[in-house]
Each structure stands twice: as C-alpha cells, then as structure tokens.
From Swiss-Prot:
Subunit architecture: F-type ATPases have 2 components, CF(1) - the catalytic core - and CF(0) - the membrane proton channel. CF(1) has five subunits: alpha(3), beta(3), gamma(1), delta(1), epsilon(1). CF(0) has three main subunits: a, b and c.
Domain of life per record: Bacteria
Principal place of residence: membrane
Keywords assigned by UniProt, alphabetized: ATP synthesis, Cell membrane, CF(1), Hydrogen ion transport, Ion transport, Membrane, Transport
Gene Ontology molecular function: ATP binding; proton-transporting ATP synthase activity, rotational mechanism
UniProt KW Membrane keyword: yes
Subcellular location: Cell membrane
Protein name: ATP synthase epsilon chain
Biological role stated in the UniProt entry: Produces ATP from ADP in the presence of a proton gradient across the membrane.
Family classification: Belongs to the ATPase epsilon chain family.
Membrane topology recorded in Swiss-Prot or TrEMBL: Peripheral membrane protein
GO cellular component, one term: plasma membrane
Length: 138
C-alpha cells in the first residue's frame, strides 16, 4: 500500500508523488505516517522529514516548520521553508550557525535571543539532514 504525498513551500512544490510512509516532527513529537493513517492536522516543528519511497529508497528534507494534514489516501505538508537534503550547502549552513552562535553571545535582550536560538536550531536541523544524507551515500 501507499499514499500520495504533497510537500509545498511558500516558494514552490518540493515533492509530489506516491510513497510508502513518512516520518516527521510534529508538535507532539515524532510521527510515522503510514497508508490509511487516521485523519490528522498538526503543526510541524523545524527538523527532518524522512520520505520512504515505493522503490525502497529514502530521501530526507529540511523543513523550517509548517502544517501537516493527513487524509486517508493523501498527506499534505504546507511548509514555511522546505529544502531537499541534496540541495543543502554544508559550508553555508555551518557558517550561518557560527554567525548565529556569535550573535547569541553578544545579544542582551531575551526577545532577540529567542530569535537567534531559533536560527541556531534551524541550522542544527539542516546539519542533521546533511549527516543523514552522508549515511545514505554509504
């Protein structure tokens, strides 16, 4: 069995096709979505989406957050930002993380620190996607 997955970011459609299952970080924790899953609407936290294709290959994407809608045969993900793992630039991600960490050390207001912590967590999630992609290559 399989289901149709549609992942759309603000900029463009990232993925559209039949899959065996997905794994995503929802507001209540990690969720595995399989064919015939109970209907569900959830907020997605920044992190990794694992896509398990029908041909037994795997793919992962970075997502900065969004909304997950599960219907019996269709799953839709509306993302703020979604980037395929193969499209991430490791050097840029590491540089952005270092800059955010340096800014965090300098910043004195809590409001700005919260924003910087969010940027750091997004960079960490992107690095996690890159690490997973490295494992796929082995």
């Amino acid at each position: 069995m399989d289901f149709y997955l549609d992942i759309v970011s603000v900029e463009k459609r990232i993925f559209s096709g039949l899959v065996d299952r997905i794994q995503v970080s929802g507001s209540e924790g990690e969720m595995g979505i399989y064919p015939g899953h109970t209907q569900l609407l959830s907020i997605i936290k920044p992190g990794v989406i694992y896509i398990f294709h029908k041909n037994k290959t795997e793919e992962c994407l970075y997502i900065s957050g969004g909304i997950l809608e599960v219907q019996p045969s269709v799953v839709s993900i509306l993302a703020d930002v979604a980037i395929r793992g193969i499209d991430l630039d490791r050097k840029r991600v590491v540089k952005a993380k270092k800059q955010a960490e340096e800014y965090f050390k300098k910043e004195t207001t809590n409001v700005k620190k919260d924003d910087v912590l969010l940027e750091i967590s997004k960079a960490i999630a992107k690095l996690r996607v890159l690490e997973i992609m490295d494992k796929f290559k082995k």
